[in-house]
Amino acid sequence: MPALRVLLRVAAVLVFLAGLVLFVFPLRTADWFAWTVVPPMTAVFLGAAYWSSAVLEAAGARSAGWDRARLAVWPVLVFTTLTLGVTLLHLDRFHLGPEHPPLARTAAWAWLVVYAVVPVAMLAAAALQLRAARSPAGPRSRVAPGLPGGLRLLLGGVAAVLGAAGTVLLAVPARAAVLWPWELTPLTGRAVGAWLVGLGVSAALAGAAGAARTARPVAASALVFVLLQVLALLRHGDALGRSPAATAGLAAVLVAVGVAAVWLLVLGRARPPH
């Protein structure tokens, strides 16, 4: 799957760069990013998601087989497709015009090209890989024991919560934003929603994985996501004052994701029985 590996490597670099601006320089998005992200808590939240995605995509690019690579491919495809839709809905908010700083304008046009090309390229590469995987001559994965029932239940719950929250933010961002711990605009609400749905798909795929070793890239990415979100809250947690219940809900989800990630990593390190 050479084409898929190249695509995942390129995607990993791109999301790392996006995360660099958002997480490290959240106050400079008006000058350096494709669109102005406010408040800074939203920028660092999105930056953490981008950086954690870089971990998953890099692992997918190094995967020897489709069983592990698909755990990166499908979430990326879902997220980029949704984000393209969000971009087109809010195109007037992007720094595409000459009135914006040159770097921000370059970032906006690059964003538009990337999100127009990557979903199509990812779908084409995945289709080729699926065709090769169905070939009788292709290698077959060894059957491995499934995940513990408790872990599957936890991952399923995380997937359901993230997917539902993301879908609501995508569909009715203005109404759903009142239930979020900090202020969201329609654009930032939908941007967060696209990430939540993508993360939910990732959790669902991890829960359906045949073995913990297969799902380790998802676990590593999820743990990075949680740690970066904790750091983001330490830096900009003053933005969370408007809804204690929503803040508690976010904390509960982060704890659940962290527990699932550590559980998967511990199981993945264990030697399979002979």
Q: What positions do the PLM features span?
A:
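Surface-exposed interaction/gating patches
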Residues: 1-20, 131-209
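An N-terminus-focused feature that recognizes amino-terminal "leader" regions
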Residues: 1-75, 87, 104, 179-181, ...
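C-terminal ends of transmembrane alpha-helices
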Residues: 20-27, 85-98, 162-178, 231-239
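Membrane-interface helix termini and inter-helical loops of multi-pass transporters
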Residues: 27-35, 94-103, 137-141, 174-183, ...
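Core segments of alpha-helical transmembrane spans in multipass integral membrane proteins
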Residues: 41-58, 78, 187-207, 224
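Hydrophobic, ordered structural segments
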Residues: 52-135, 232, 242-270
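Hydrophobic alpha-helical membrane segments
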Residues: 75-88, 195-199, 218-234
